[in-house]
From Swiss-Prot:
UniProt source species: Salmonella dublin (strain CT_02021853)
Gene Ontology MF terms: metal ion binding
Gene responsible for this protein: pyrI
GO cellular component: aspartate carbamoyltransferase complex
Gene Ontology BP, a term: pyrimidine nucleotide biosynthetic process
Protein name: Aspartate carbamoyltransferase regulatory chain
Cofactor binding mode and count: Binds 1 zinc ion per subunit.
Amino acid sequence: MTHDNKLQVEAIKCGTVIDHIPAQVGFKLLSLFKLTETDQRITIGLNLPSGEMGRKDLIKIENTFLTDEQVNQLALYAPQATVNRIDNYDVVGKSRPSLPERINNVLVCPNSNCISHAEPVSSSFAVKKRANDIALKCKYCEKEFSHYVVLAN
Protein backbone atom coordinates (compact mmCIF):
# COMPACT_ATOMS: atom_id res chain seq x y z
CA MET A 1 0.00 0.00 0.00
CA THR A 2 1.44 3.38 -0.98
CA HIS A 3 0.60 6.81 0.32
CA ASP A 4 0.94 10.05 -1.59
CA ASN A 5 2.36 12.45 0.97
CA LYS A 6 1.69 15.80 -0.63
CA LEU A 7 1.38 19.18 1.02
CA GLN A 8 -2.25 20.11 1.34
CA VAL A 9 -1.35 23.79 1.60
CA GLU A 10 1.43 25.20 -0.59
CA ALA A 11 4.80 25.93 1.06
CA ILE A 12 5.93 29.53 1.47
CA LYS A 13 9.44 30.84 0.84
CA CYS A 14 9.57 33.39 3.65
CA GLY A 15 7.14 34.30 6.42
CA THR A 16 5.11 32.80 9.24
CA VAL A 17 3.18 29.55 9.53
CA ILE A 18 0.72 29.17 12.41
CA ASP A 19 0.08 25.44 12.69
CA HIS A 20 -2.04 23.29 15.03
CA ILE A 21 -4.83 25.84 15.36
CA PRO A 22 -7.99 24.15 16.64
CA ALA A 23 -10.48 23.56 13.81
CA GLN A 24 -12.95 26.43 13.35
CA VAL A 25 -10.59 28.94 15.04
CA GLY A 26 -8.48 30.00 12.03
CA PHE A 27 -10.91 32.62 10.73
CA LYS A 28 -11.33 34.10 14.21
CA LEU A 29 -7.55 34.53 14.47
CA LEU A 30 -7.39 36.20 11.05
CA SER A 31 -10.06 38.67 12.13
CA LEU A 32 -9.00 39.41 15.71
CA PHE A 33 -5.33 39.82 14.91
CA LYS A 34 -6.08 41.74 11.70
CA LEU A 35 -3.82 39.37 9.81
CA THR A 36 -5.61 40.09 6.54
CA GLU A 37 -4.66 43.79 6.66
CA THR A 38 -1.65 43.18 4.44
CA ASP A 39 -0.89 43.03 0.76
CA GLN A 40 1.09 39.82 1.32
CA ARG A 41 -0.26 36.44 0.26
CA ILE A 42 -2.12 34.54 2.98
CA THR A 43 -2.89 30.84 2.65
CA ILE A 44 -5.48 29.28 4.93
CA GLY A 45 -6.13 25.61 5.50
CA LEU A 46 -9.34 24.76 7.34
CA ASN A 47 -10.34 21.42 8.84
CA LEU A 48 -7.13 19.74 7.71
CA PRO A 49 -6.48 16.22 9.00
CA SER A 50 -4.24 16.07 12.06
CA GLY A 51 -2.89 13.00 13.83
CA GLU A 52 -2.83 14.79 17.19
CA MET A 53 -5.99 16.89 16.94
CA GLY A 54 -8.23 15.05 14.50
CA ARG A 55 -8.78 18.27 12.54
CA LYS A 56 -6.86 21.54 12.56
CA ASP A 57 -6.60 24.92 10.88
CA LEU A 58 -3.42 26.41 9.45
CA ILE A 59 -2.43 29.96 8.45
CA LYS A 60 0.55 30.91 6.27
CA ILE A 61 1.50 34.57 5.82
CA GLU A 62 4.24 35.39 3.35
CA ASN A 63 6.93 37.98 4.16
CA THR A 64 5.38 38.70 7.56
CA PHE A 65 6.66 37.75 11.00
CA LEU A 66 4.71 37.84 14.25
CA THR A 67 6.14 39.61 17.29
CA ASP A 68 6.64 37.65 20.51
CA GLU A 69 3.66 39.56 21.93
CA GLN A 70 1.44 38.46 19.03
CA VAL A 71 2.60 34.85 19.35
CA ASN A 72 1.79 34.81 23.07
CA GLN A 73 -1.64 36.36 22.54
CA LEU A 74 -2.48 33.32 20.42
CA ALA A 75 -2.38 31.23 23.64
CA LEU A 76 -5.92 32.29 24.49
CA TYR A 77 -7.31 30.80 21.27
CA ALA A 78 -4.80 28.17 20.25
CA PRO A 79 -2.63 27.19 23.24
CA GLN A 80 -1.21 24.17 21.38
CA ALA A 81 -0.36 26.15 18.23
CA THR A 82 3.12 26.14 16.75
CA VAL A 83 4.41 29.31 15.12
CA ASN A 84 7.13 28.65 12.55
CA ARG A 85 9.43 31.27 11.01
CA ILE A 86 10.22 30.32 7.43
CA ASP A 87 13.21 31.52 5.40
CA ASN A 88 14.08 30.13 1.97
CA TYR A 89 11.47 27.37 2.47
CA ASP A 90 13.17 26.16 5.69
CA VAL A 91 11.91 26.42 9.26
CA VAL A 92 14.45 28.71 10.96
CA GLY A 93 12.54 29.26 14.19
CA LYS A 94 9.74 27.54 16.05
CA SER A 95 7.80 28.76 19.07
CA ARG A 96 4.71 27.97 21.06
CA PRO A 97 2.53 30.63 22.62
CA SER A 98 2.58 31.10 26.37
CA LEU A 99 -0.18 32.95 28.18
CA PRO A 100 0.78 36.64 28.50
CA GLU A 101 0.14 38.82 31.55
CA ARG A 102 -1.82 41.30 29.41
CA ILE A 103 -3.60 41.29 26.05
CA ASN A 104 -3.77 44.64 24.27
CA ASN A 105 -5.57 45.85 21.14
CA VAL A 106 -7.24 42.53 20.31
CA LEU A 107 -10.33 41.87 22.44
CA VAL A 108 -13.53 43.82 23.04
CA CYS A 109 -14.91 44.26 26.56
CA PRO A 110 -18.23 42.42 26.96
CA ASN A 111 -19.46 45.05 29.45
CA SER A 112 -21.68 47.30 27.32
CA ASN A 113 -21.27 50.12 29.87
CA CYS A 114 -17.46 50.06 29.63
CA ILE A 115 -15.92 53.35 28.55
CA SER A 116 -13.85 51.48 25.97
CA HIS A 117 -16.97 51.33 23.78
CA ALA A 118 -17.50 55.11 23.76
CA GLU A 119 -13.94 56.42 23.80
CA PRO A 120 -11.12 55.96 21.27
CA VAL A 121 -8.96 53.81 23.55
CA SER A 122 -7.14 50.56 22.87
CA SER A 123 -8.51 47.54 24.67
CA SER A 124 -6.41 46.09 27.45
CA PHE A 125 -7.05 43.04 29.61
CA ALA A 126 -5.04 41.57 32.48
CA VAL A 127 -4.82 37.78 32.17
CA LYS A 128 -5.32 35.64 35.27
CA LYS A 129 -5.05 31.87 35.17
CA ARG A 130 -7.65 30.06 37.27
CA ALA A 131 -7.96 26.35 38.12
CA ASN A 132 -10.23 25.49 35.17
CA ASP A 133 -10.42 28.78 33.32
CA ILE A 134 -8.64 31.95 32.32
CA ALA A 135 -10.05 35.22 33.64
CA LEU A 136 -9.65 38.51 31.79
CA LYS A 137 -9.94 41.81 33.67
CA CYS A 138 -10.69 44.94 31.65
CA LYS A 139 -8.31 47.84 32.33
CA TYR A 140 -11.11 50.41 32.06
CA CYS A 141 -14.22 49.05 33.79
CA GLU A 142 -12.17 46.67 35.99
CA LYS A 143 -14.73 43.90 35.55
CA GLU A 144 -13.45 40.35 35.34
CA PHE A 145 -14.79 37.85 32.81
CA SER A 146 -14.19 34.23 31.90
CA HIS A 147 -12.14 34.17 28.71
CA TYR A 148 -14.99 32.27 27.04
CA VAL A 149 -17.28 35.29 27.53
CA VAL A 150 -14.73 37.69 26.04
CA LEU A 151 -13.91 35.39 23.12
CA ALA A 152 -17.60 35.05 22.24
CA ASN A 153 -17.96 38.82 22.16
